[in-house]
Amino acid sequence: ALTEPQKTALKDSWKLLAGDGKTMMKSGALLFGLLFKSHPDTKKHFKHFDDATFATMDTGVGKAHGMAVFTGLGAFVSSIDDDACVNGLAKKLSRNHTARGITADDFKLLQGVFKTFLDEATGKKATNEHKAAWDALLTMLIKAHS
């Protein structure tokens, strides 16, 4: 389970990452853009994306995926004080991604770009505490998926 300071840091940083739907779409596009740029091999998991989507994530399907991911992350942040719910969400996330052939190692690649994502998405307003809290949450999700 996450510590109280980590939970607070997640909630605080979430306001910067997902203030509204437009911000959530922008955050999703940025996160996946960083993933695809850093790890082009991850594109194999997104068979329904075309070159334009991979280039900018600024297509209907790209925006929809980014929004879905950030809606899911929002569920974790919103329920972060309820360990049973967080664990249930982690198991659901794992089931959904296992069915698509996405491994814990694939999640680790996303985790690897997350600090850069936080810097870029927040205009460098993400603190070390924010970064550590997201790293702890992602580590927990990876563990649930292993």
UniProtKB/Swiss-Prot annotation:
Q: What GO terms fall under cellular component here? A: extracellular region; hemoglobin complex
User: Where is the Globin domain positioned along the sequence?
Assistant: 1-146
For this UniProt entry, the molecular function terms from Gene Ontology, in alphabetical order, are: heme binding; metal ion binding; oxygen binding; oxygen carrier activity
List all membrane-crossing ranges: none
* Binding-site list for heme b: H65, H97
Give residue numbers for the modification (N-acetylalanine): A1
Q: What family does the entry list?
A: Belongs to the globin family.
Q: Identify this protein by name.
A: Globin
